[in-house]
Amino acid sequence: MTSIFHFAIIFMLILQIRIQLSEESEFLVDRSKNGLIHVPKDLSQKTTILNISQNYISELWTSDILSLSKLRILIISHNRIQYLDISVFKFNQELEYLDLSHNKLVKISCHPTVNLKHLDLSFNAFDALPICKEFGNMSQLKFLGLSTTHLEKSSVLPIAHLNISKVLLVLGETYGEKEDPEGLQDFNTESLHIVFPTNKEFHFILDVSVKTVANLELSNIKCVLEDNKCSYFLSILAKLQTNPKLSNLTLNNIETTWNSFIRILQLVWHTTVWYFSISNVKLQGQLDFRDFDYSGTSLKALSIHQVVSDVFGFPQSYIYEIFSNMNIKNFTVSGTRMVHMLCPSKISPFLHLDFSNNLLTDTVFENCGHLTELETLILQMNQLKELSKIAEMTTQMKSLQQLDISQNSVSYDEKKGDCSWTKSLLSLNMSSNILTDTIFRCLPPRIKVLDLHSNKIKSIPKQVVKLEALQELNVAFNSLTDLPGCGSFSSLSVLIIDHNSVSHPSADFFQSCQKMRSIKAGDNPFQCTCELGEFVKNIDQVSSEVLEGWPDSYKCDYPESYRGTLLKDFHMSELSCNITLLIVTIVATMLVLAVTVTSLCSYLDLPWYLRMVCQWTQTRRRARNIPLEELQRNLQFHAFISYSGHDSFWVKNELLPNLEKEGMQICLHERNFVPGKSIVENIITCIEKSYKSIFVLSPNFVQSEWCHYELYFAHHNLFHEGSNSLILILLEPIPQYSIPSSYHKLKSLMARRTYLEWPKEKSKRGLFWANLRAAINIKLTEQAKK
């Protein structure tokens, strides 16, 4: 209780400061365990909380903390300070919390300090109480820690008028039995914690029955000598009967005999104490004390924690009998290695029993019919194994509402019998056991709160007893692969299912669980596929207060490309997840593509191109069957000329005369095409038997369909032979917009190839004819000419 109270004061002060101040790191400075030998000089003037504990500081000067005008909490415990002048804090007017415990202080010099709420001078080397008259002005003081080896009643007078919430008094190792027994009587405090010297037989006569004290804690009690029989300590406890205000008594770190331990219990039994707690006990010797007097007690709760005992030289049933027949409402025995507990000999008033962290087995309270008033039973961390036996144990506990059997080795085997629970049970904690899916066939019918986390559950069977009253279910840290739904749990409002194997949660979960007000399902290996999309959509319709940990704890685990992605950021297109829509889209796309291709074929005259390709292919196939020498002999012309009929005047009067006068053999369609052959075949033959193909380009050319065909086959021959056999003569300029779309090859050729432009000036024509003759000049064989 002392540590809790101490912590609460610190926590409230720090919380108050954090509310009032910004949370910037410069306000909170922690230099503990840094090996410091003096107070750091680089502290910010805004420092509010300074922790320099567990260092080697031996002195504290005004200059060390002069600049820290906003300092409220200073923790300088566990250092080597021997002398302190409290005036060093005269410039720290906001200082409220000062911890100087666990130093080597032997003397202090006082100075008026009115704002301190917490002052700890305990565990130091003072000979007398370090209380001076200036302490009397600390009207806000709530905690005072002191240490001394010499106690006098007069030392307390300066602060007797102060109402201090908690006083901690540490008595030095030289404190003895000759000290003033009334030295504590002038303390005005609600809570008093006295720490006696360690490892020293208790021979003190101090009167701890301070009239204002409601909470008393005594630490370091050693009385193991048989001749002593713990008489000194028992005398101190006996005086507590004169303090009607005392309601809480705590004993820490006790080393005594079994007889003395039971005597302590017996003595406290007849005081005004309501709550009695004993912890860290070491017991030895025999137990002869058998006749425990339970009458006339005010005690409501007894707690015994962490007991170590030598080898028992007496039947343990003596102890169990004393414990089981106690006429109190709340009884706790934990960390004692207790192996059994007897059933009370008559109807017991126990309402709350806590036997956690012991060695109890399934036989505890077997066939016990005297715990009819019991409401809460805690058996966690024991040696329980068979659930059916535990359930049977509860059948005679007609008032039992809460049962905790967590952290055992409990399992359920259907072959070993059915489960019969008390009908009154409302809350059941079976976490951290080895339970499997079968547990859902062995549950109390009226259960409201069920904790099954950290077991071996893989699924919740559909054929289970309907738990219509179940409101809270915790199945975290199992191996569940889906959210359970509320078909069998119609009242379920709280579900904890984090850290399982849920990958594809059911999309209709929220529809089936209309009463859900809190669900914690994060930290599962969600597979971000189409199936998860519906679940995520349903989450968007749920309040953020319902889904705990959303969105940070809900992440994709698969596929690898999505791993680590928050579910709220995961999206898949409707098309990829809807098969029907995908098929319709594909069919529609194919139809559109078919219509488009058909239209393009019609517009670009694709059938004609196909026919021409067939003719070209047939001609080329025939040509491949002719030997190379014969192909060379077949080269009969220097050039084939393709032109529009509208340009025939220029061809016959300009082009032919200038070429043929130099002996050039020219192929013209009106004089060299073979009658009877198809026009296409004549064109192909003429192109193949010509060294070059000359095209006379003009606006008339692009309007001629046959010119188009001739250009098409010449272009094919160009790429097939890998030669440079194409010559373009631009007779008249051709605007790009006037070239039909079907002449796309002409556009391409004009963009990529150099052409000869017919000059209008006569002076330039000589060079034109020279270039043209040079381009088509080749020596034909005599046989080819013939």
Curated annotation (Swiss-Prot):
It comes from the Eukaryota. Residues 313-316 are annotated as: Interaction with bacterial lipopeptide. Residues 525-579 form the LRRCT domain. Changing residue 651 to A: Severe impairment of activity. One of its GO terms (molecular function) is transmembrane signaling receptor activity. PROSITE patterns: LRR (PS51450), TIR (PS50104). One of its GO terms (cellular component) is plasma membrane. Coiled coil: none annotated. Glycans are attached at residues 51, 137, 163, 330, 429, 578. Ubiquitous. Highly expressed in spleen, ovary, peripheral blood leukocytes, thymus and small intestine. Residues 635-776 form the TIR domain. Disulfide bonds join 110-132, 223-230, 343-368, 419-442. Residues 25-580 are extracellular. It holds the Pfam family TIR. Changing residue 554 to C: Severe impairment of activity. Changing residue 720 to P: Severe impairment of activity. InterPro entries: Cys-rich_flank_reg_C (IPR000483), Leu-rich_rpt (IPR001611), Leu-rich_rpt_typical-subtyp (IPR003591), LRR_dom_sf (IPR032675), TIR_dom (IPR000157), Toll-like_receptor (IPR017241), Toll_tir_struct_dom_sf (IPR035897). Interacts (via extracellular domain) with TLR2. TLR2 seems to exist in heterodimers with either TLR1 or TLR6 before stimulation by the ligand. The heterodimers form bigger oligomers in response to their corresponding ligands as well as further heterotypic associations with other receptors such as CD14 and/or CD36. The activation cluster TLR2:TLR1:CD14 forms in response to triacylated lipopeptides. Binds MYD88 (via TIR domain). Interacts with CNPY3. Participates in the innate immune response to microbial agents. Specifically recognizes diacylated and triacylated lipopeptides. Cooperates with TLR2 to mediate the innate immune response to bacterial lipoproteins or lipopeptides. Forms the activation cluster TLR2:TLR1:CD14 in response to triacylated lipopeptides, this cluster triggers signaling from the cell surface and subsequently is targeted to the Golgi in a lipid-raft dependent pathway. Acts via MYD88 and TRAF6, leading to NF-kappa-B activation, cytokine secretion and the inflammatory response. This is Toll-like receptor 1. It comes from Homo sapiens (Human). The lineage of its organism: Eukaryota, Metazoa, Chordata, Craniata, Vertebrata.
